[in-house]
A protein has these predicted regions:
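Active-site phosphate-binding strand-loop segment of PLP-dependent enzymes
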Residues: 142, 146-215
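Conserved core segment of the aminotransferase class I/II
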Residues: 224-297, 308, 386-387
Length: 391
């Protein structure tokens, strides 16, 4: 018998793997499941991006190992994008590191800087990787509750001194997954000040900065003067450019964090396929605000369809200004797990139970906007029929 390493025994199976198995079991029985649990765009990238990949992959010299640091073209494209979008100036060589999707970067950064027994400050609810990365590194997680009455922002002013003395990383994520909440520059100023005072590495996961609604424009933590002295920001082309399957992300900011992350990554992977790096650079150069606004308008329409249905069935929701989700408080008498399982089993609609994201999510479900609009309409009709019809 082979036993798992103790580090792996500290963490549960990735929650979406478990949910996907439930869905597959239903599909195997012929159930038409509408998957509103997956946080990925359903729309394609810009056509020039696909054409760039098709053209570049024909070259005979692009199939070698790509190098560990990323191509100069891609690093400059990321730096230029941050300058255009946020007014932030970054050194492409020392402050920009392309990633095989930001998820691996979140893990590798944690492994690079967290020792056994160190504390990692993690929002609750949150993207599960922040928590599991800390546990795999031997760290301890200190949860920062995200409460609706506090706009789903963590209370940074009342973290116990003893916790801060032992903490190494502070994770933030705005626009937020799963709540759809947003943060202001004033909030980021407080976070940067806290990181500076307690020698924390502030890690801001920001893949949804270009997925926003109702005129809201999301900031970068790196816009705060001096933030790059204490902060690293993770971004991705997955949500902003509809390229989730391409696996292109980036870490930007603090030079020590970038160097440590590179040292870890270079011992684990061998970089991003060169044609994908070239196409990603094209995406960063060619993306236009009009394209983003049109895409986000489609998401906003889906959001509103979901909000209308949730209101009709008596489910409490907040109108998200960013990210790809509606965070819905489930009806009385249900936990989030129970409600999600009931809707999946009875209506064939898959929501993500809020408990996947932490104990503060136990009374919520996360509903994704990354589903074609006609399927959103059908899913909401099924949910209305199930609940209002009393089935």
């Amino acid at each position: 018998m082979y036993s798992l390493a103790r580090r792996l025994q500290r963490i549960p199976p990735y929650p979406f793997v478990v949910l996907a198995q439930k869905v597959q079991d239903l599909q195997a029985r012929g159930v038409d499941v509408i998957r509103m649990d997956i946080g990925a765009p359903d729309m394609p990238p810009l056509k020039p991006v696909i054409e760039a990949l098709k053209s570049f992959v024909q070259r005979p010299d692009v199939h070698r190992y790509p190098g560990y640091k990323g191509t100069a073209e891609l690093k400059v494209a990321f730096a230029d994008y941050y300058h255009r979008r946020f007014g932030v100036i970054l050194d492409p060589e020392r402050q920009v590191l392309p990633l095989l999707g930001s998820k691996e970067g979140l893990h590798h950064l944690t492994l690079a800087f967290v020792n056994p027994g160190d504390i990692v400050l993690v929002p609750d609810p949150c993207y599960p990787t922040y928590r599991t990365a800390a546990l795999l590194a031997g760290g301890e997680v200190y949860a920062l509750p995200l409460k609706e009455e506090n706009e789903f922002l963590p209370d940074l002013e009342h973290i116990p001194r003893g916790i801060l003395q032992k903490a190494r990383l502070l994770w933030l994520n705005y626009p937020n997954n799963p709540t759809g909440a947003v943060a202001t520059l004033a909030f980021f100023e407080k976070a940067v000040a806290l990181a500076r005072r307690w020698n924390l590495l502030l890690c801001h996961d920001a893949p949804y900065t270009d997925v926003t609604y109702d005129g809201y424009v999301a900031p970068s933590v790196l816009q705060i003067p001096g933030a790059a002295e204490v902060a690293v920001e993770f971004n991705s082309l997955s949500k902003s450019h509809n390229m989730a399957g391409w696996r292109v992300g980036v870490a930007l900011g603090n030079e020590e964090a970038i160097a440590g992350l590179l040292r870890m990554k270079s011992n684990v992977d061998s970089g991003i396929f060169l044609p994908i790096q070239h196409a990603a650079a094209v995406a960063l150069r060619q993306i236009e605000r009009d394209w983003i606004l049109k895409r986000n308008a489609i998401y906003a329409r889906r959001r509103d369809l979901i909000l209308e249905t949730m209101d009709a069935i008596g489910v409490k929701t907040r109108r998200p200004q960013g990210a790809l989700y509606v965070w819905a408080h489930v009806p009385a008498g249900f936990s989030g797990d129970e409600f999600a399982d009931w809707v999946l089993t009875k209506a064939g609609v898959s929501f993500a139970p809020g408990s996947m994201y932490g104990s503060e999510g136990r009374d919520y479900v996360r509903i994704s906007l990354g589903v074609p609009t006609d399927r959103v309409e059908e899913a909401m009709q099924r949910v209305r029929k199930l609940i209002i019809g009393g089935s």
